[in-house]
Amino acid sequence: RAMVLLEKNVAFAGSDATFGFINTQNQTIATSNLKNRGVISDFRAVAATSQNFFMLSIGNPALLYKAEQSGMEEVYREEHPDVFYDVLRFTDDQFGIAIGDPIDNRLSVVTTLNGGQQWTKLMWSQSPKLEEGESVFAASNSALAHYGNKLWVVTGGSKSRVLFSDNKGYKWQDLATLPLAQGQATQGAFTIAFYNDQQGIVLGGDYEQPTERKGSGALTFDGGKTWQPIATDKAIGYASCVQYIPNSEGNALVATSPNGLFFSN
């Protein structure tokens, strides 16, 4: 359900506690299953530093693991009936952040400042307040984007917005309401990417109507303050992941969806 590029390999994790590594040199795949105290977790979020690979489970309990030569180490655990983490990212070798569904209408935010050795959850009173029925989608681990020290998170459901932080997730601001389909649990922004600190894209739509193009994407050229809808005849319908191709001057992107793999230049 998620993958990340390492120095020489691709690491991935998914359903039924499965994780593994793809050797990009000889094209071999090694898989394993992780059981912790009898818990069989599903993983939808992975991330890596230059030293370690991390994977984060969905559901209760939320389990965050760090891969080491000696095996997997549990570095964070959270238990709550409503706990559900959607995305995990590192902006450098020290700072990492995980974003999860709201608990009592407040977004779940967990961060590390020491390369993933210890993780701390942002106080409930400091976390962004979401509307009833508003949440974050576990969409290909891409509901959060970063550039430098800037973070953007997209929401969906009853409301689709962009939340922004420029201080490692300690304080957040409601940056913009998105011109995407919203109002239903299956609608909203699913994925966001930034080429630099000004140019970005969001894709989403309605995963129960994957061919509906209206309200499925938008572009920004001012850091996420304002968003221009992608014209219906140019849109691809529902998408769960979009990324800029490096060194393309912001012109080349790839996106994935149930309708296929798409490229734009």
Question: Which stretches of residues belong to each language-model region?
Answer:
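Loop-centered beta-sheet repeat module
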Residues: 129-176
